């Protein structure tokens, strides 16, 4: 549902503004033309006082012309202002490289600069080559028993989320990790077993998303200080954060696709959302493993699996999705996000595997 807010404003404003402008213009031309008529063209009624009054009015024509011209100019300025207001979301989205999900990046030899990701601690942008094939591995319990580990590891780049482990699950989820996208709230979970996640993962790129004071670089937010300590503990560790501009871009995409402002609708974007965005930038072809469709949980007998493959016995996946989708505020919109991913799959080479389903 692209440009929903923008289109609504434009439709609301365009026709009334246009009609009012036309009416004012016609009225102005009519009044000015009548005032400028030569005296011999004024209908004679035999009433000299009427003709005298008309003559006096004709002397006021230049003043009326000036007044009407000023009115038209003022109204035109208001029109321009209202149109700019209506187009503001579209302009903002364009400035933030709005068309990323719909159009693939051009493939050029050599590394590319990705300015939406800032390294810790020097703040430099991410520089790397595109991945020809990517495996995006969901944390879903759908992965249990899949036996897809070797296929996942066969992709050029493997993307994982938060603290999802590989040890003990290699047969189903593989063991390679090229990029791990982490929520700022999940950083402490990785620190519980930091040697597993960081000590032997020098080839892994860590990208942390989050907003607010905890991620503040200037003031040294708590999460950012933790990331700094990690880079000191493990020299050469590749840690990046989403820039504020990139975070705003992700919010804007959500609004463009759903017609809802993320904050006003009480929504929190999931790590899955923040994983698909860089995947669209970094990958030429994407296979998403373990992600169900937006209609899966509304089917008669959906398969019951744990929300996370590494947390057995916890809340059922579909129960978690429904709980968040129906919550009035402070919730992830998992089902809504999956509907968006389905639309993206119509424009980009994205395939969903285990369960396998086609974009609608």
From Swiss-Prot:
InterPro entries named in the record: Glyco_trans_29, GT29-like_sf
Top enzyme category: transferase
Covalent S-S links between cysteines: 134-283
A GO term from the CC aspect: Golgi membrane
Positions of glycan attachment: 193
Pathway per the UniProt entry: Protein modification; protein glycosylation; Glycolipid biosynthesis
The EC number(s) this enzyme carries: 2.4.3.7
Residue ranges, Cytoplasmic side: 1-71
Protein's UniProt keywords contain Glycosyltransferase: yes
Membrane topology label: Single-pass type II membrane protein
GO molecular function: alpha-N-acetylneuraminyl-2,3-beta-galactosyl-1,3-N-acetyl-galactosaminide 6-alpha-sialyltransferase activity
Tissue: High expression in brain and colon and to a lesser extent in lung, heart, kidney, spleen and thymus.
Gene Ontology terms describing biological process: lipid metabolic process; protein glycosylation
Keywords of this entry: Disulfide bond, Glycoprotein, Glycosyltransferase, Golgi apparatus, Lipid metabolism, Membrane, Sialic acid, Signal-anchor, Transferase, Transmembrane, Transmembrane helix
Catalytic activity: an alpha-Neu5Ac-(2->3)-beta-D-Gal-(1->3)-D-GlcNAc derivative + CMP-N-acetyl-beta-neuraminate = an alpha-Neu5Ac-(2->3)-beta-D-Gal-(1->3)-[alpha-Neu5Ac-(2->6)]-D-GlcNAc derivative + CMP + H(+); N-acetyl-alpha-neuraminosyl-(2->3)-beta-D-galactosyl-(1->3)-N-acetyl-D-galactosamine + CMP-N-acetyl-beta-neuraminate = N-acetyl-alpha-neuraminosyl-(2->3)-beta-D-galactosyl-(1->3)-[N-acetyl-alpha-neuraminosyl-(2->6)]-N-acetyl-D-galactosamine + CMP + H(+); a ganglioside GM1b (d18:1(4E)) + CMP-N-acetyl-beta-neuraminate = a ganglioside GD1alpha (d18:1(4E)) + CMP + H(+); 3-O-[alpha-Neu5Ac-(2->3)-beta-D-Gal-(1->3)-alpha-D-GalNAc]-L-Ser-[protein] + CMP-N-acetyl-beta-neuraminate = a 3-O-{alpha-Neu5Ac-(2->3)-beta-D-Gal-(1->3)-[alpha-Neu5Ac-(2->6)]-alpha-D-GalNAc}-L-seryl-[protein] + CMP + H(+)
Subcellular location: Golgi apparatus membrane
Sequence intervals crossing the membrane: 72-94
Ranges per topology, Lumenal: 95-360
The keyword Transmembrane is annotated on this UniProt entry: yes
Record-stated family: Belongs to the glycosyltransferase 29 family.
Function statement: Transfers the sialyl group (N-acetyl-alpha-neuraminyl or NeuAc) from CMP-NeuAc to the GalNAc residue on the NeuAc-alpha-2,3-Gal-beta-1,3-GalNAc sequence of glycoproteins and glycolipids forming an alpha-2,6-linkage. Produces branched type disialyl structures by transfer of a sialyl group onto a GalNAc residue inside the backbone core chains. Prefers O-glycans to glycoproteins or glycolipids.
Protein known as: Alpha-N-acetyl-neuraminyl-2,3-beta-galactosyl-1,3-N-acetyl-galactosaminide alpha-2,6-sialyltransferase
């Amino acid at each position: 549902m692209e440009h929903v807010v923008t289109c609504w404003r434009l439709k609301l404003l365009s026709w009334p503004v246009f009609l009012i402008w036309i009416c004012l213009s016609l009225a102005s031309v009519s009044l000015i033309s009548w005032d400028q008529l030569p005296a011999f063209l004024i209908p004679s009624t035999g009433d000299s006082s009427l003709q005298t009054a008309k003559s006096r009015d004709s002397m006021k024509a230049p003043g009326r012309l000036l007044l009407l011209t000023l009115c038209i100019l003022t109204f035109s300025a208001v029109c321009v202002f209202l149109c700019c207001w209506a187009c503001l979301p579209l302009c903002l989205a364009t400035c933030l490289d709005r068309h990323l999900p719909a159009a693939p990046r051009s493939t050029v030899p050599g590394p590319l600069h990705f300015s939406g990701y800032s390294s810790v601690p020097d703040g430099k942008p991410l520089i790397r080559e595109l991945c020809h094939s990517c495996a995006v591995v969901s944390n879903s319990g759908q992965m249990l028993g899949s036996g897809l580990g070797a296929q996942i590891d066969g992709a050029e780049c493997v993307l994982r989320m938060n603290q999802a482990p590989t040890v003990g699950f290699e047969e189903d989820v593989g063991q390679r990790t090229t990029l791990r996208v982490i929520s700022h709230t999940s950083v402490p979970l990785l620190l519980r077993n930091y040697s597993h996640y960081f000590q032997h993962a020098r080839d892994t790129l860590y990208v942390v998303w989050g907003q607010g004071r905890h991620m503040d670089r200037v003031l040294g937010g708590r999460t950012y200080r933790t990331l700094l300590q990690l880079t000191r503990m493990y020299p050469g560790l590749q840690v990046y954060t989403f820039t504020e501009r990139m975070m705003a871009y992700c919010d804007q995409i959500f609004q463009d696709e759903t017609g809802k402002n993320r904050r006003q609708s009480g929504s929190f974007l999931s790590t899955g959302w923040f994983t698909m965005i860089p995947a669209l930038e970094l990958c030429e072809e994407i296979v998403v493993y373990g992600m169900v469709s937006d209609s899966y949980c509304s089917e008669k007998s959906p398969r019951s699996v744990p929300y996370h493959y590494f947390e057995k016995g916890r809340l059922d996946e579909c129960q978690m999705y429904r709980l968040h989708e129906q919550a009035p505020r402070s919730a992830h919109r998992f089902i809504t996000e999956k509907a968006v991913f389905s639309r993206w799959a119509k424009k980009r080479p994205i395939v969903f595997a285990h369960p396998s389903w086609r974009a609608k």
